[in-house]
Amino acid sequence: VLVRRALEELQDHVHYYYRHRRSAAFCQMAAQTIDELKSAGLSGAQLAELAPDCGPESGKLSELALIFQGYETLLAGTGMDPADRLELAADRLEAALARGELPDFLREREVFIDEFDTFNAPKKRLMGAMLAALPTVTVALCDDGAPMVPGDMGLFSGAKQVAAQLRQLARKNGADAAVPELLRRDLRHKDAPGLAAVTELLETGTC
């Protein structure tokens, strides 16, 4: 809906895509593209700046940048988009840090983040601000504790990459990274012996 509204408001400024404004499939695809760009940390203005240097597709990319900017304008400050909520939280935290303060939503709070499987730009920005502001931030990842091997595409490779990114982010923000604690006891299923047995079977081949 918001992509369609952005197209309607742009009207004569959009040549390639305006005729698709009533296509639900196009609007959905455009919204997904915008979401991917936002996850990569790119804004509509940045895309507009990059588009002219993209060869034959520069015209279409420039129009996509206009749609993206219109979409951002319609959403500005509303927090309707989950990615925007992360950006708004990071804005508030960074502004408070610049004043030497901590926002109310983080005062006297312990921060625990459970099982990142992705680590996009908005999350990275908010995490960096929290690492700079808070005494401790605890992150739980699903990992086997083995060292990361370059080129590894195994089950736990994503978690290992996230752990490496977190250590780098901590150093960048002047925070120390604690030695990881590997939990080998299955506390999650302590009250469900059947599930505990299945978990052990999957991990070891016996139960």
Language-model-detected regions and their locations in the chain:
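Basic/charged alpha-beta structural segments of nucleotide/phosphate-handling enzymes
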Residues: 1-105, 160, 170-200
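A short catalytic or substrate-binding loop motif that flags glycine-/basic-rich loops and adjacent residues
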Residues: 80, 119-120
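Short, well-ordered beta-strand core segments
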Residues: 86-89, 111, 137
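Active-site-proximal flexible loops/turns
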Residues: 88, 121-122
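Flexible, charged surface loops at secondary-structure boundaries
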Residues: 103-108, 131-132
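Conserved P-loop NTPase "ATPase switch" module shared by AAA+ and STAND
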Residues: 106-119
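Conserved RecA-like helicase ATPase core segment
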Residues: 123-207
